[in-house]
Amino acid sequence: ALKTGYNFGITVEAFHHTYVVEKASLPPGEYTNINGNIGLSWGLIAAAKKANLDLFYGSYPITPASDILHELSKHKNFNVITFQAEDEIAAAAASVGASFTGKLAVTGTSGPGLALKSETISLALSAELPLVIVNVQRGGPSTGLPTKPEQSDLMFALYGRHGESPLPVIAAKSPSHAFYAAYEASRIALKYMTPVILLSDNYVATGSEPWNLPKIEELNNLDTNIITKLNTEDGFLPFLRNVDTFARPWALPGTPGLEYRVGGLEKEEGTGNVSYDAANHQYMTDMRAWKVSNIANDIDKLEIYGDESADTLVLGWGSTYGGITQAVNRLNEKGVKVASAHFVHINPFPDNTLEVISKFKKIIIPELNTGQLLKLVREAFLVDARGINKVSGEPFTAQELTDKIEEKINE
């Protein structure tokens, strides 16, 4: 039927003008068409396999994240365990429990669900257990626009927990990149024993593109902190940290000699005993922050795209990647000097971010919110960045960004 319709379309003389889309120029390889939710799901499966762990996904159905649950439920042959909970809190709590037992634990949701999960995320952070939290953003607040894209949960991802509770935040920038973003979120969670928030949005989740399938052997193996023996001569210290990553050991229930208590109460460094000591709480608060900031040394550098001799840099994150890249291409072709850089890691920022930003006189930040990354960049790097903001439930078009960036350059 598809071929018949195609043949009819190219032969019928019903139109005054026709336009044939040229075949895409793609590197050689095996391709499949993929959307962001499927790419993200496959990235989680690949991460579990490369870490030699079972994957646990606890979720409550919510648009536009539900398809992750649907996709993962098809892959029990890869030891994927899917759990549809009675509510968002139960889904997150079950995932924390799965992490405690040695699973690559993931919970997924959209904005309203992220708010409900916040206390349980704090528990994972306090217990220092690996957990990936997927937030497929949509229009808000409240029920908002469930089927429309928005990037308005960035500040909540960074700060939406009680107490001093920093955690890594990364963002997928395209449907195919969602695979690698999920893999990276899993790597960080497992290596550093921390919850990680992975941001997607409806545009990435339901958008589609051809994807060159990677070979599983090309993906790096993922390290874990699983321990099977005593880590001191005198016994087991559940919060004796790795000197490089500051991660604590991951002792699984049932391992002889490695019994310990864990929960939401503050713990004593080393022993993990409940502690109300003032100096210890200060140290543990600082240590949890150091652990996250230290990740900046273990992530990709921020790369410049376009004319590096330009005075203007367009900074973006998440699903604005395609529109920004196309707009920069069009402006460069017109002779307008402009470059771009795109954040995947937002907390912490790549360690060369200041170096990149300092090369340019003008910083422009397009976002599908009212300027959340803009505020972060201004605060962190003391630059007078300017925003291009849109909260209409629609993505930026390439032409829209081309026009608005050129206007900002000429101001």
PLM-predicted stretches and their roles:
Residues 1-160, 165-167, 171-172, 385-387, ...:
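Thiamine diphosphate
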Residues 164-187:
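Active-site/ligand-binding-proximal alpha/beta "capping" segment
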Residues 8, 60, 71, 100, ...:
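Broad hydrophobic/π-residue packing in well-ordered secondary structure
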Residues 64-68, 90-93, 114-117, 139-143, ...:
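Flexible loop/turn segments at secondary-structure boundaries
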Residues 12-29, 33-43, 47-51, 186-411:
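Flexible, low-complexity linker and terminal segments
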